[in-house]
Amino acid sequence: MRHGGGDNERVYVAALILLAVLLGWPIPRLLPRVTVLRAAPAAAILLWQSVSLAAIAAGLLAAPLAVLVQARASSGQHDPEPGQHLPLLVAGLAVTAFVAGRLLLKAHLVGTDLRRGRREHTELVDLIGVDDPTLGEHVKVLTHPTQTAYCVPGSRKRVVLTKGTLDALDADQVAAVLAHERAHLRQRHDLVLEFFTVLHTAVPTWIRSTAGMGEVKLLIELLADRWAATVVGRRPLATAMLALASGSHPTSALGAGDDAVVRIEQLAVGDRHRNRVIVAAVLASVAVLQLPILLMVATLVS
């Protein structure tokens, strides 16, 4: 038995557990404060995904590796005999299977609920909405005075505008709203949001980060804004957002007026700091994804 190796193994496992805790609780609460990331929303979303995946990996690996280290230490040898400490190993794998199973179950439930909600809302919109050939395909207009615009993703995708929106906006502003919503649909931002919604609902309530979830939603809107700004310009998009800021939309949809003030500020900033933010976010994403893998390998070979 190598006592030094055993001590190192415990350190690596402890570091893995600490990593899972840090990535799962304080970091999702602190990362929204790094507002400079909003200059590059795609890279920022990549960083958020990397943090989430690394937290999951660290959490799934911690239990079986901790059991393996304990089995090695109690057996008095670096590699236990096959079958020795089997109950401990089964217990460790059971914890991992429970966590993974909970994630998969939540993924199924969230996905099913979202798809059902979108399907039902699309059917309702098709029933009460009217077509306007001047607005393009998949657009429905609701005869309502409120100023609202949103999209419903899915196989039967729709962009929904109200009569109040069309009355309040000029042609360039309407084009900006349509470009924003079509960016959501074309780039499948709903799948990104679904990924984070699954993780948010899969963990216990006291771990969930409302600020983190809100920041991800904002980044998705900023991503659509960047696309729309390249199509119609920043000014029509900004003024349209102000007009729609008080509008509402279904929870299963993506709306154009959310977080209007912050989004307009980002439009004003433009591409300032964008390249540096992209480089920093990508490097941070790669680094954080490697941490649980490196700690696992270090535990196994020490």
State the predicted function of each range.
Residues Q49-L60, V279-V286:
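Select subsegments of transmembrane alpha-helices in polytopic membrane proteins
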